Amino acid sequence: MKKIILISFVLCMVCSAAEGKKAKKDLWPDGTEISQWFKKEAPNVESLGKKYVLTDHGVKTDSTLLQTDAIQAVIDKAAQEGGGVIVVPKGTFLSGALFFKQGTHLHLEEGGTIKGVDYIRWYPVKDSRMEGQNLKYFAALINAEGLNGFSITGKGTINGNGERFWREFWIRRQYNRQCTNLEAMRPRLVFIRDCKDVTIDSVHLINSAFWTCHLYKCERVKIQDAYFFAPHTPDDAKAPSSDAIDVDVCTDVLIDGCFLSVNDDAVAIKGGKGTWADQDPNNGPNRNILIQNCRYGFVHGCLTLGSESVEDHNIVLRNIHVEKAQRILWLKMRPDTPQKYCYVTIDNITGSAQNLLFVRPWTQFYKQEDRADMPLSICDHITLKNLDVRCSTFFNVGPSDKYKLSNFTFENLKITATKDKSFDTSFIDGVKIENVEVK
């Protein structure tokens, strides 16, 4: 009898442990399970095929020599021979736009640099995507389109060499305050379009003339242990619109263990703009975006939804440390665009920022058109929890007849606000506040 009781007790303990383990599943904000795909995994470069070292195929170790054609020839050769890894050895290689083909990958050895030439004519105009619209625009320095299984790896550097472009941008702004980003004619650093199973690992992506890494209509992208930087000083040579990562109509994106410091948003969730943006097949939602274990220097927003965004669902920013950010979570609400920002969670954040939460209308370069059935924009199920942050303003949020805020949760917050401690949530429909200290 005692033996039966003991066995029953052990079985109960095992079942309880199993239930406990089951209860600890990692979940998206909407309650669905985060799949095992989102585990960080180091790429195996050796498994990607034959290595094509640039200097073994006619590319010179002369940092002043423009070698776009020679480098592209190596990429084309690898593609023609069934694919492989384009290896950038130690040294600096000056280039214009490069186009990767199916089966090819880029690996930058430590001390190896691809440096962008600072003349726009070396970045040909192509069918492209910028600022929430499909249009003709300049190619990036590194381009990948329609590829399955593309990777950029190694401890080397892709340097946009953007200073000439930055200075010319600010000169334009001196005589024309309404000069737009597109009119300034600048190349992005990396543009990856219509690709699946993409890995960017360990590389340094610096000094982009425009956006740093733009993902458009991609699925299953991992950006791991990468370093993103563009300067925010001095005023006449800071890097305008140098977003670190632009996620544009993408599904399943992991950003893990990165450092980000740029003169614009760190991670910007995009997807389309305009009064009929929700009906344009070129636009669409972003789903299942996980940003974790990152460090932030100066940025305009650690996580920004918009300004060109239509629908974002299951967006998580967690386990990060911030220093000198202007905003931690920024929800840009365009009056001219129907927007749905749903199930967004900010969890376990430490450090300092000017604003913790910022939700206001965004009207830069917007164009309101007549639409009888214009949907009301919404921000729904927004959660901030487990934060220990120093800031000037904690709650920089305002009401508007152009959007509705609902189901906001504030839980376990320890906030030091040096300028504005106000926390008026009366205009939010459904608010949960638990263990919040603002001093």
Can you describe what each PLM-predicted range is?
Residues 1-6, 10-87, 92-194, 201, ...:
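Extracellular "leader-to-stem" segments immediately downstream of a signal peptide or signal-anchor
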Residues 110-111, 148-157, 196-207, 219-233, ...:
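Right-handed parallel beta-helix
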Residues 21-30, 173-175, 206, 265, ...:
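Short charge-dense sequence patches
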Residues 65-68, 285, 378:
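Electropositive phosphate-/nucleotide-binding environments in soluble metabolic enzymes
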Residues 15-16, 213, 267, 385:
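A general, composition-driven signal for non-globular sequence regions
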Residues 87, 119-120, 127-129, 199, ...:
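Mature catalytic domains of secreted/periplasmic carbohydrate-active enzymes
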Residues 97-100, 113, 117-118, 140-145, ...:
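Glycine-rich beta-solenoid repeat tracts in large extracellular/virion proteins
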